Each structure stands twice: as structure tokens, then as C-alpha cells.
A protein has these predicted regions:
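Extracytoplasmic cell-surface/polysaccharide-interacting catalytic and binding patches
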Residues: 2-217
Length: 217
């Protein structure tokens, strides 16, 4: 039975590959991410890696998670506004070190290997969901994974509130469902990136992801 399930998983992944649903990304990088448009608009993705000399000053939140100190005022303001609407949220993930990012990617790869995929295929499949070290916004400290507190607010309620309101505080959903072919990351309703209020408003109004917005500047 276990072997049968593994075969089904491998077959399912192959069918998704053939249908174009899975987008494989490479571990190799092309350029260092640029700050030409400001620190808040640094584009980090599979072709723009974080420069080796990039420094971030972190602030620890009440729950122990860390973020870039510059986003704390707007992040706090957003959470206060949510509470006024009876939406109680928390930052589930903030800043990550390169080591932590590598560990998460390795764990995801090992999971797919345990399901019967060869190492190379498992890694490439994992990269659809986990960024390689140096290409994760979590290493900038500008990205936060936000969830409901599980006491008064469900994750879905938090996601709905963020979808409607996050841009007012300078945050945007970084990996929208309809932008996967551009971001090369599957939809993540919990992952929000600070870009500043001006950019967030324009991205919200024009339905742009960060790649599209930076290209338009």
C-alpha cells in the first residue's frame, strides 16, 4: 500500500509537470538584488539574490519573531487596526538566517524524497514552495507570515482581512494566486511583504506583483 501511494504521488507530480502547473526553478542566481528604487522595493527572487554585504537591523516582536526595524511602526499600526475589526493576528515567521532557510529547503526536499522522488526532482519540486538561501525575502526582514491567533481568529479570516486592508499600511501579498508564472512561487495567502504605502497602493489598484511594479519604474 505504501509503495502504491508513492507511485501515485510520483505519477501525479509528473502529470502536473506535463500540464505546466509546476514551475521548476534553478538554485543558480543571475544578479544581486538592487536597492536603486529604495530599500523597501528591493526585489529578491530566484534571479535576484541578496547581496553578501546586505545588513539588516532587527527588532524582536512580542512573540520573539524578528523583523527589519524599519517596518515595525506600520506593522504595529496594521495589527491595531485589525484588532479594531475583531481580527486577532500574529506573525508566525519573520526574519530568517541563511542557515534556517537552507534547513527548511532541505527538510522539504527530504519529504519529497521520502515519497519516492529522486533527489534532483525532489529539490526542484521543493523550490516551488521554498526559496533557496539568498533568494528568500525572509532574509531581508521585510517579509512576514501572518496567521490568525487560533483563539479568536482563524487563518482564513486573517487572510481575508489582509487581502482588503494590508496595502493601507504598506504591505502587499507577495505571492498572489494569479501571478505564479511571474513570481515562480505558489500562492501564499499568509506571506506579506513591506513595500511602503505609496507602492502598496499602486500595486493594489493595478493588481501588480512586486516584479511587475519594479519593472514599471
Amino acid at each position: 500500500m505504501r509503495l502504491f501511494k508513492k507511485c501515485l504521488l510520483v505519477l501525479g507530480i509528473l502529470l502536473l509537470i506535463l500540464s505546466g502547473y509546476i514551475i521548476f526553478r534553478s538554485d543558480t542566481f543571475i544578479d544581486d538584488a538592487s536597492t536603486n528604487h529604495g530599500w523597501n522595493l528591493m526585489l529578491v527572487n530566484h534571479t535576484n539574490r541578496i547581496p553578501d554585504n546586505y545588513k539588516v537591523i532587527l527588532t524582536k516582536l512580542d512573540n520573539g519573531k524578528e523583523v527589519d526595524s524599519r517596518i515595525v511602526p506600520e506593522l504595529s499600526q496594521m495589527f491595531r487596526a485589525a484588532r479594531k475589526d475583531d481580527i486577532y493576528m500574529q506573525v508566525n515567521e519573520g526574519y530568517r538566517s541563511s542557515y534556517s532557510q537552507q534547513k527548511i529547503l532541505d527538510n522539504r526536499t527530504d519529504y519529497y524524497k521520502s515519497k519516492g522522488l529522486f533527489t534532483l526532482l525532489a529539490r526542484r519540486y521543493a523550490l516551488n514552495y521554498v526559496s533557496a538561501p539568498g533568494t528568500s525575502e525572509h532574509q531581508l526582514g521585510l517579509a512576514v507570515d501572518i496567521v490568525g491567533d487560533n483563539r479568536y481568529t482563524t487563518n482564513q479570516s486573517a487572510y481575508r482581512w489582509l487581502e482588503k486592508n494590508a496595502y493601507k499600511y504598506g504591505f502587499v501579498k507577495r505571492y498572489p494566486k494569479n501571478k505564479t508564472s511571474i513570481t515562480h512561487i505558489k500562492h501564499e495567502p499568509w506571506h506579506y511583504r513591506y513595500v511602503g504605502k505609496k507602492a502598496a497602493l499602486k500595486m493594489h489598484q493595478k493588481n501588480l506583483c512586486l516584479e511587475e511594479y519594479v519593472e514599471s519604474l
